[in-house]
Amino acid sequence: MALQRRTTLTKYLIEQQRETNNLPADLRLLIEVVARACKAISYHVSKGALGDALGTAGSENVQGEVQKKLDILSNEILLEANEWGGNLAGMASEEMEQFFPIPANYPKGEYLLVFDPLDGSSNIDVNVSIGTIFSVLRCPDGQQPTEQSFLQPGTQQVAAGYAVYGPQTVLVLTTGNGVNCFTLDRELGSWVLTQSDMRIPVETREYAINASNERHWYPPVQQYIGELKDGKEGSRQSDFNMRWIASMVADVHRILNRGGIFMYPADKRTPDKPGKLRLMYEANPMAFIVEQAGGAATNGEKRILDIQPKSLHERVAVFLGSKNEVDRVTRYHLETKK
């Protein structure tokens, strides 16, 4: 019986390093460390109640959100896995108010790691897919970062990815040369390439939005969703299906595989806030991945990757997925603004 040749994450990254000359060794090693941390998080997620990791931790993060035990554990895993490797100048996490400088007793590198350690954590206790989102930037200030060092537009990302902890654990990755998906082989402990050069279909008949907030939406979103709900009898002359998991990684992963549009708009309840999702930890890495897969991502008015962050925890509205639908809802926003 012939041995089946499979491409592991390590092999894929080494081949990219050789073929494109566009993947520095330090960046390759950093991605591998993040992937190992995601394996550890996946293990704790899969233990569920058996690992005493369910439930709340009795604390809030900088966003004012109640932290789950797994939120805190996942954050610690990512920090501890990456602080000593010598590839990073600093890290920033959705769960921490300030950025995390690399301790003085460890070597430092030229990259910055930004992450949401456990996206969709409201779903932990009900066993719905959750995940980790991460982004890598170069540190413009050498090895002594300040908060300003992190405040770079998404176009400056050198890598981004997410892991989904679901029926399978998968890692989706881009280094600016397309999007690939790796599945965790638990028997071997390796990430194995299972989807290459992922592409989002341009046309779609699915959309993801929290429809319970409809009464709070601004007119452009109400107009767009109204057209989708009207189906064949309306101006779009086609039926659309709504899918909403309330876990960004799960919703985006579905869209990456079969098309669709994900929307988390600003609304009238908090008119002083431009949205709910975090630009640095969620919107930028997902926008990078989606664009690399042929999709589009905007805040309703401009490309997400072009937004200049003003703070580590800045929030934005998000519309991403199949290009034609993102372009349409963005056009409605711009027409309303005229």
UniProtKB/Swiss-Prot annotation:
Keyword annotations from UniProtKB, A to Z: Carbohydrate metabolism, Cytoplasm, Hydrolase, Magnesium, Metal-binding
UniProt keyword Magnesium, yes or no: yes
- Its Gene Ontology molecular function terms? fructose 1,6-bisphosphate 1-phosphatase activity; magnesium ion binding
Question: Where is it located?
Answer: Cytoplasm
EC number(s) recorded for this UniProt protein: 3.1.3.11
Which pathway does this chain act in? Carbohydrate biosynthesis; gluconeogenesis
Main location per the UniProt record: cytoplasm
**BP GO annotations:** fructose 1,6-bisphosphate metabolic process; fructose 6-phosphate metabolic process; fructose metabolic process; gluconeogenesis; sucrose biosynthetic process
> Which InterPro entries does the UniProt record give?
FBPase_C_dom, FBPase_class-1, FBPase_N, FBPtase
Q: Which residues bind Mg(2+) 1?
A: E94, D116, L118
Q: Which reaction does it catalyse?
A: beta-D-fructose 1,6-bisphosphate + H2O = beta-D-fructose 6-phosphate + phosphate
* Gene3D superfamilies assigned: 3.40.190.80, Fructose-1,6-Bisphosphatase, subunit A, domain 1 (3.30.540.10)
Q: NCBIfam families recorded for this chain?
A: PRK09293.1-1, PRK09293.1-3, PRK09293.1-4
The similarity annotation says:
Belongs to the FBPase class 1 family.
Q: Which HAMAP family match?
A: FBPase_class1
**This protein's name:** Fructose-1,6-bisphosphatase class 1 1
What organism does this protein naturally occur in?
Paraburkholderia xenovorans (strain LB400)
Q: What is the lineage of its organism?
A: Bacteria, Pseudomonadati, Pseudomonadota, Betaproteobacteria, Burkholderiales
User: Could you tell me the gene encoding this protein?
Assistant: fbp1
